[in-house]
C-alpha cells in the first residue's frame, strides 16, 4: 500500500509540473504576443505621424523674381505690373516691371495675379490646442490667476495640423497668446513653417496679457437671480488686486532681489519698455481705469484688445499712443441695442478717430477660424474701410502693434521675404487662391491634410 501511494504521489506531482509548465508557456506566449502587438502599434503610429507631419521648407538657395503681378505692399501703396526680387530670405527690389534691372534666379510670371505680404494673426492661440475635446492637447490656459511668467512659446506645437491649415489662405505668422486668469501670461510671435518652437519664433515674449475686470455684472438666471446688468460691487476690489500686484512687482525689481520671485521677474520688460502690456478690456470705464492706473504705475507701452466703447475714449487712446486690436468682423452685436451691422463697421468708426487698428482672433472656434483672417479684413473693407487700409490691419498695422514691423508686415526692401501670390483678391473668398507662398524666402508647401482630402473626394465625384 505504501509503495502504491508513493507511485500515485509521483504521478500527481508530474501532472502538476506539466500543467504548470504549460500554463507558464502560455503566459509567456501571451506576453510575447502583447509586446509584439504594442510594438507594432507604436511603430504604426510613429510612421503614420511621420508621414502626416508637415515638412518645413529648406533654406533659400537661389533668388526669385516675381514679375507682372499687382503688388499690394501693405503700406497702402499698390504697384501694377510689378517686379519683386528676393534672395537670402530678404527682399532686394520692389518696383515696376518696366525697371531696367537684371532679373535674378527663378522667374515667376505672375501676370494677372496679386502678391501680398504674409498675413499676421494677432491675439491668436494657434498651436496651443489641437483638439478642444481632448484635455491633453489643451495648453492655452494655465492654473492660477496672476501668471506673467507663463510663456506660451514653449507650449507652441509647430507641427499642429491646425497651424498648417492657415497657410493656404496666406496667414503665415501669428501672435501665440495664452488665455485665462487675470494675468494670462506672455505671448510670442512665430512664423508658420518650422520644425519646433525655437525655429518658429520671430519675436520671443513680445507682450504680457491681462484680462481687465468688468464693472458690470449679471445675476445667475439659472439660480433665480436677476439677469439684468448692474454694477459689480467687487469691481474696485478686483482692480486694486491688479494695481497692488504690479506695484509689488515694481518694488521687487528695484530691490536687491535676494529671494527670487519668478512671476515678478517676468514683468521686468513692462517697466523698461521692452515688452508691451495687452489689456483685454471692454467699456469706457474699464478702458479709462486700465490706462490711467497702468500709466501711474509706470507701464507705458500699452495695447488695447477688444475695446468695446473705445471710440468714446478715443482722445485718451490717441494721447497715450495706444493702438487697438479689435475682434473679428464675423460676429453678432454685443449689446441688445447695438446696430445690427456694428460689428462690421467697428474698424471704420475707430479708424475715423485716428486710432491704429489691428485685427485679433480671440473668440469662438478661434484656432480654426484664424484661416478666415483675410475675409474678416475684407468684410471691414466692405463696410467703409478701403481695401488697402483693410490689408494694413492684418499686415503692417499688426506688425507695428506686435513690434515686428522692422522686418515683416510689408513688401519693402530689406524686409523678410514672407509673402504669397494669389490668383485674385486675397481679401475675397473667390479670389483667395494661392499659387505660391514664401516664408523668409523659403518656398513652402500649400498642401495640408484638408487639401488632400478635398482633392481625394473631388476626384471621386468628378464627372468624365
What are the residue ranges of the model-derived segments?
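Divalent metal-coordination and catalytic microenvironments
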Residues: 69, 84, 89, 112, ...
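Polyanionic/metal-chelating signatures
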Residues: 162, 169-301
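Histidine-rich, glycine-flanked metal-binding segment
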Residues: 71, 75-116
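C-terminal cap of metal-dependent C-N hydrolases
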Residues: 69-72, 80, 412-457
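His/Asp/Glu-enriched, well-ordered alpha-helical/loop segment
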Residues: 68, 131-132, 137-143, 149, ...
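Glycine-enriched alpha-helix->loop->beta-strand junction motifs that scaffold or abut catalytic
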Residues: 294-301, 318-325, 354-356
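Bacterial Sec-dependent N-terminal signal peptides
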Residues: 1, 5, 9-13, 18-59
